Swiss-Prot record:
Involved in both the tricarboxylic acid (TCA) and methylcitric acid cycles. Has both 2-methylcitrate synthase and citrate synthase activities. Catalyzes the condensation of propionyl-CoA and oxaloacetate to yield 2-methylcitrate (2-MC) and CoA, and the condensation of acetyl-CoA and oxaloacetate to yield citrate and CoA. Has 2.3-fold higher activity as a 2-methylcitrate synthase. Catalyzes the formation of either (2S,3R)- or (2R,3S)-2-methylcitrate. It comes from the Bacteria. The active site is at H223, H262, D314. GO terms for biological process: carbohydrate metabolic process; propionate metabolic process, methylcitrate cycle; sporulation resulting in formation of a cellular spore; tricarboxylic acid cycle. Bifunctionality as a citrate and 2-methylcitrate synthase is likely important in the mother cell's physiological milieu. Belongs to the citrate synthase family. This is Citrate/2-methylcitrate synthase. Its EC number is 2.3.3.-, 2.3.3.16. SUPFAM superfamilies: Citrate synthase (SSF48256).
Length: 372
């Protein structure tokens, strides 16, 4: 008789890989990135410094930062025929689908695509990271029949990203807050999209293929699409009491409310959400309008009281992006663009110490049926 194997739905609690990249230490409420606390990094380091840490395993020296910035800037434009491909997409295409198509198509420009060595994949990752802001912004603008906005060499990575999405030059506060959001979204151990990327990479597929699979995973509203759902929900209410009533109605109907709860942070607030909550308050202070902040706080209190659930990063990132003037359909593509750095690190690690993922199933169907 076959031995009964343990089954864990959703692979909950299953250790699927060994990694040197990141770890969610729920006991100390820390998100460790190469041994550093992500929250502390978000207060003092830029997104590009996080990119270097993730891909090189250490924080950069000043001279290395200058080299990295030049490399990223030199890769910030998209080929003209690549933009024409995006023009062929239907008008109602979601930007995540445009992003997935555009990312997959970039593989055709790589003449060394079969070289999966760490050095080749790192160089590929830097090139991709240079193009992600332009691809994210251009796919949205082209689908909506608008001209893409070209990057400005005088702007920082995050300022350029914001500029290409909104068409306006960001203030120093807006640039700082957006950059911090990219840091917070950059890496998070083994969520669904990272697992998908590593599974694909384990077949010796290329970096583009692994990232394209991750885009498809991140589009789902149980993973990345939650930030868009949060903002649409907030826009349904005009006042704090309206929002509380809206949440109560949804709870009575047993509807899922996006932006709350997390598979890992089950009994605590996502520490990244606290950073975005502070950022939202800063933006509301600057605007002289605290309505969104007060609504979010009221929702946070209500969900903790009624369901014992705490906000995750998406809950506060959504209104932050709204205050920055970013169109809602771009929220999830931003998430993916930021996470590209972590995903690339995971694919490189998977290729370097690979074993093909091949799990089994617990069969629940009939056995040994015969033809009548």
């Amino acid at each position: 008789m076959e031995e009964k194997q343990h089954y864990s739905p959703g692979l909950d609690g299953v250790i699927a890989a060994e990694t040197h990249i990141s770890y969610l230490d729920t006991q100390s409420s820390q998100i460790l990135i190469r041994g550093y606390d992500l929250i502390e990094l978000s207060e003092t380091k830029s997104y590009l410094e996080l990119v270097h840490l993730l891909l090189e395993g250490r924080l950069p020296e000043e001279s290395e930062m200058e080299t990295l910035e030049r490399k990223i800037n030199s890769a910030s434009s998209l080929p003209a025929d690549h933009l024409r491909l995006l023009e062929l997409l239907p008008e109602d295409t979601h930007p995540m689908d445009g992003l997935r198509t555009g990312l997959s198509a970039l593989a055709g420009y790589d003449r060394q695509i079969d070289d999966r060595s760490p050095s080749a994949n790192k160089e590929r990752a830097y090139q991709l990271l240079g193009k992600m802001p332009a691809l994210t912004a251009a796919s949205y603008r082209i689908i909506n029949k608008k001209e893409p906005i070209l990057p400005l060499q005088t702007l920082s990575y995050s300022a350029n990203f914001l500029y290409m999405m909104t068409g306006k030059l960001p203030s120093s506060l807006e640039e700082q807050i957006f950059d911090r959001s990219l840091v917070l979204y950059s890496e998070h151990e083994m969520p669904n999209s990272t697992f998908a990327a590593r599974v694909i990479a384990s077949t010796h597929s290329d970096l583009y293929g692994a990232l394209t699979g991750a885009v498809a995973s991140l589009k789902g509203n149980l993973h990345g699409g939650a930030n868009e759902a949060v903002m649409y929900l907030l826009l349904e209410a005009k006042t704090t009491s309206d929002f509380e009533q809206l949440l109560q109605t949804k709870l009575k109907r047993k509807e899922k409310i996006m932006g709350f709860g997390h598979r890992v942070y089950m009994k605590k607030m996502d520490p990244r959400a606290l950073m975005m909550k502070e950022a939202l308050q800063q933006l509301c202070d600057k605007a002289g309008d605290h309505r969104l902040y007060e609504m979010c706080e009221a929702g946070e209190r209500l969900m903790e009281k009624e369901k014992g659930l705490y906000p995750n990063l998406d809950y506060y990132a959504a209104p932050v992006y709204w205050m920055l003037g970013i169109p809602i359909p771009l929220y999830t593509p931003i998430f993916f663009s930021a996470r590209t750095s972590g995903l690339c690190a995971h694919v490189i690690e998977q290729h370097a110490n690979n074993r093909l993922f091949r799990p089994r199933v617990s069969y629940m169907g009939p056995r040994y049926q015969t033809k009548s």
